[in-house]
């Protein structure tokens, strides 16, 4: 009886840790909320482009973010 409870507790801990690690990847895709640097870079590129959607595209897409970094370096 005690060994089955111990096994259930271990399984519950494993499931909880897996659920917690996957739930952080399931956010809305806004990576600007995670890092202040990315938010600032995307804001500058959005202001320079004059395109209202550029900021949100930069926050969601790694390709757009790296392209923005390249534009700011030049």
From Swiss-Prot:
Keywords for this entry? Answer: Disulfide bond, Ion channel impairing toxin, Neurotoxin, Potassium channel impairing toxin, Secreted, Signal, Toxin, Voltage-gated potassium channel impairing toxin
Q: Name one GO molecular function term.
A: potassium channel regulator activity
Protein family membership = Belongs to the scoloptoxin-03 family.
Q: Does the keyword Repressor apply?
A: no
Q: What is this protein called?
A: Kappa-scoloptoxin(03)-Ssm1a
Q: In which compartments does the protein localize?
A: Secreted
Naturally occurring in which organism (per UniProt): Scolopendra mutilans (Chinese red-headed centipede)
Gene Ontology cellular component list? extracellular region
């Amino acid at each position: 009886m005690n060994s089955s409870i111990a096994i259930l507790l271990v399984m519950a801990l494993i499931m909880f840790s897996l659920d917690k690690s996957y739930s952080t990847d399931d956010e809305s895709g806004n990576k600007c909320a995670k890092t202040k640097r990315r938010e600032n870079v995307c804001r500058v590129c959005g202001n320079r482009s004059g395109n209202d959607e550029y900021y949100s595209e930069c926050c969601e897409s790694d390709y757009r973010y790296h392209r923005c970094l390249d534009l700011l370096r030049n």
